[in-house]
Amino acid sequence: MPRAIEPNPAYKRAMVVVAHADDAEYGCSGSVAKLVREGIEVVYVLCTDGSKGSDDPQDTQESLSAVRKQEQIEAGKVLGLTTVEFLGFPDSELEPTLALRKAIAREIRRHKPDILICQNPTRSLEIAGYVGHPDHQAAGEAALSAVYPTARDRLTYPDLLEEGFGPHKVREVWVMLGPERGDFFNELEEEDMKKAVAALKSHESQVQYPEVDARMREWRGRTGARVGFKFAEAFKVFTLG
């Protein structure tokens, strides 16, 4: 039974872990805008360096990575993020390795989020003409494994303790999903939609179609229609013990 996400006044911080610059803007930027509006501090963690997603023969890996990093910083300003962390793993080569899990766990311990939002760790075959990106799956799997048990358990990676990063228990995990698979729906206000669209437009190297606003509203509108909302984003939500 689909349910609405209700704000929890005890929550103060949230973290979004994604593979690439623009992934969060496509998947959960309305919810990020809403969280910030509700007084939640939000941090992004970008797993890859964003160095591969271009057909422009003038681009190099180094130049593209620098552009995409700046675009993500600008999108973060639109949404009101506290900070954006860049882990710098090679784009299009991301795997759910122990190194990636540890790097994400370090950021969880550093920022101590109550909510962690991540990508679907399974291949999505819901969208016509799209078979899913392996980096997205890797980022989702590593994020979930970092939440439990790596960030939680004090004796996992003692060197993180030496760095000053003690264990932390995330209280909720929101996995980004399409409207057909989500079981929790976050209702978005017009203010949230405007910021989500503006944030996505910050990614000029990747978002090169003119109807960004219309598409975003159509996507969020279709999601919201499942539960009687004008706009919404869908998640699988886990409350952790």
Question: Which residues does each predicted region cover?
Answer:
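Active-site rim/loop-helix segments in enzyme catalytic domains that contact anionic ligands
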Residues: M1-K112, K236
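Metal-dependent de-N-acetylase/amidase catalytic core
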Residues: M1-M15, L98-G241
